[in-house]
Amino acid sequence: VGLYSNYLMLSNKLLLIEQIIFSSLVASIGNVIARDSPEKRLQIFQAMQSASFIFCGIITAGFGLLANDVITVWLGKEYTFSMLTVIAVTVNTYFSCALQPLWIYRDATGLYMKTKYMMLAGSIVNIVLSVILGRFMGIAGIIFASAIARLSTYFWYEPKLLFHEYFNSRTTGYYISILKNIGLLACVIAVLSYVFSGWVVTDWMTLILKVVVTAAVCSSIFVLAYCRTEGFQVIMNKVRQICGHTGR
């Protein structure tokens, strides 16, 4: 548990960037839900989702590629997890990132009142799977159980409810977009893992250099992949607002 808390802290710090940006949109989304047509609501949601895909690519790839290096330099190699466990934490990090727009809409629409029993079901599934997978896979199994519980319950139920009640649309395109993002992300992590396989991090200087290179490469790939989407414009507008407030 102590080892996992270190990885969880790293994951949460990375996710905080996206959470700050998206949480500031809750009031605006409430106005969209109250005033605009289902088509406009869907358009705004898709813009937020494509923005989250950029964050997902950078945050999740960065975590998967660098988590063990950070822990090694920070605490020592004896405090690192196996690659299987890092993958499990990375999967959970991805879903926490990719589901941000859905959670924002859930809060803005009050949809959580209709999903509370599904959330309870997810918790029960998580507990059962944690016991089963934990016996066979250790800490990795317990962490994977959380991801499986999400996938088997509210991951499919909440979008179905949101799209049906507020967008008058099917969820097919939503799931396809997530699969495409996962595919691109998996390719990026696999290729960079191979490219960086000979890069041994031994101190803070080599770690910082690897972080900078990883961030630059991942940012370039995912910005290029989504730069034509409305979500990219959402990010740029928020960056301009932050820079504008800072400059005053």
Q: What are the residue ranges of the model-derived segments?
A:
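Helix-loop junctions and terminal segments of transmembrane helices
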Residues: 7, 11-49, 103-108
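Short alpha-helical transmembrane segments in multi-pass integral membrane proteins
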Residues: 8, 44, 49-64, 140-165
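Membrane-interface junctions at transmembrane-helix termini in multi-pass inner-membrane proteins
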Residues: 90-122, 136
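Short membrane-interface helical motifs at transmembrane helix boundaries
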Residues: 58-77, 132, 136, 194-199
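Interfacial segments at transmembrane-helix termini and the short loops linking adjacent helices
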Residues: 63-94, 167
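Membrane-interface helix-loop junctions in multi-pass transport and translocation proteins
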Residues: 113, 120-155, 159, 169-172, ...
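Interfacial/gating helices of multi-pass transporter permease domains
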Residues: 1-12, 78-84
